[in-house]
Regions:
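Alpha-helix N-cap/helix-start motif
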Residues: 41, 117-118, 149
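Conserved small/polar residues in nucleotide/adenosyl-binding loops
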Residues: 151-156
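Cys/His-rich Zn2+-binding cysteine-cluster or related metal-binding knuckle/ribbon modules and their
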Residues: 2-8, 13, 17, 25-83, ...
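Extended interfacial segments that mediate partner engagement and assembly in macromolecular machines
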Residues: 26, 76-143
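Acidic, metal-coordinating catalytic cores used for nucleic-acid/nucleotide bond scission
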Residues: 143-150
Length: 156
């Protein structure tokens, strides 16, 4: 006998696709959603779809922005003479929580990982270089250092 009937197994499979959601957590999410009212499930699905439709990437920094608001608020309202380079939007959220940084960001969209086929061409490095103009006074690299990126940066 199967552990779960097909509709529940498919739902577990979908939750399992989320980062940091393993099998047991996916099962808990799926079973909890079955305990929710139909209205709650519809609202959850509606918010998920609305977010997917209405959240885009800023054409300047690569951060999230609402559809129709491009460039994002940070790019429009902040000091563009200081650029903080980060791996992804989670890093922007973390830095914004401090309330201390007043410059703009540039999201690379990942890290160098030649073993995974991720080189400079797969990251937003060209876009970063285009942003570095004489008006830019400082570029802060706020990524986690690792042996691969150091090797790549030092070799011709």
């Amino acid at each position: 006998m199967k552990e779960f009937i097909d509709p529940i197994a498919r739902l577990i499979n979908q939750f399992n696709k989320l980062p940091a959601v393993g099998g047991k957590t996916a099962q808990r999410y799926a079973l909890k959603s079955l305990d929710m009212s139909e209205g709650e499930v519809e609202e959850f699905a509606r918010v998920l779809l609305d977010t997917k439709k209405n959240v885009k990437y800023c054409s300047v920094c690569g951060n999230f922005t609402e559809a129709g608001a491009d460039p994002c608020d940070i790019c429009r309202k902040r000091d563009s003479s200081v650029i903080c380079v980060v791996k992804d939007a989670k890093d922007v959220f973390a830095l914004e929580k401090t309330g201390e940084y007043e410059g703009v960001y540039h999201i690379l969209g990942g890290v160098l990982s030649p073993l995974d086929g991720i080189g400079p061409e797969q990251l937003r490095i060209k876009e970063l270089l285009k942003r570095i103009t004489p008006e830019v006074k400082e570029v802060i690299v706020a990524t986690n250092p690792n042996a691969v990126s150091y090797t790549h940066l030092t070799l011709p």
